[in-house]
Amino acid sequence: MTLLRRIILFSILLCIGLASCQEDIVSDNPTLRLSFSHDSLLFDTVFTTIGSSTRQMMIYNPNRNAILIDRVEMRGGKSFFINLDGENQIENMRDITLRGGDSLFLFVRTKIDPQSVNSPVFIEDTIVFYLNQTKQEIFLQAYGQNVEILRGSNGFLQCDKLSLTNEKPYLIYDTLVVTGNLSIQQGSTLYMHSGAMIYAYGNVIANGTIENPITIRGDRTDRLFDSVPYRVASGQWGGIFLVDAESMLPPRYEFDHVDIISGSVGLYALSENSVRRPKLSLTNSRIHNHAEYGLVLQNIDANVAN
């Protein structure tokens, strides 16, 4: 290589090196804005004391020059928690330089304090980004719901008999075993945690109405994808198992206006006695979106109709 070519090559490499060492130009132009993947986040029903899943969004700088984010603030209370690119202390979210064309991760979750009311509670807050004498906002909203938690020990909760009311929803964490009669009032909602099941060894009376149906579903209230809520995703909980305990009288099962959704098994009724069979009435009900079986009947006198 000739001396001239070496000088030219060295000059090019030197220019590249100097350019790479230059600091990003931080613009204070108030017309430059950040771009958000979402301008608001809505959390579907969040159970009080339990907390939500974590939602993610992106903060972009679509401009050529860097932008200095002076500080980030939460405008409202303390029901929402944020993590900005690994920093979860809001007081430390200041003097953040976001290079041109670069982005930041923002994670948001919420935990709602228990309320004295049983109906859903609406809460909201705002994340405020201050930059270049301007501000930009992301709106946060959530519905909180008080629930009655049914949780046992070693994964089981056993009851002699059980009456579930519609005063507030139930969150069933473990396998619920009812050795006597089980009744579920119209308008009741049962949220089943992952792996939770119901075993009923006595009579089961679950009579909803068209105005106040009974709902038995998984406890995920967020979304699998933006257009697909978790409530329709199968395999979220175990199933409902009706077992004949071989008592003097065969058990009686009544389900009317009941929606059973998103389990591994919907309704499984089993008897070993082919002579003294339990009776099942299943009317005006929906059993759908289950991973294995929707309805299984063995030695059951059944009336299934809509």
Feature locations, PLM:
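Asparagine-centered strand-capping/turn motif at beta-strand->loop junctions
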Residues: I59-N63
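Bacterial N-terminal signal peptides that target proteins for export
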Residues: M1-I8
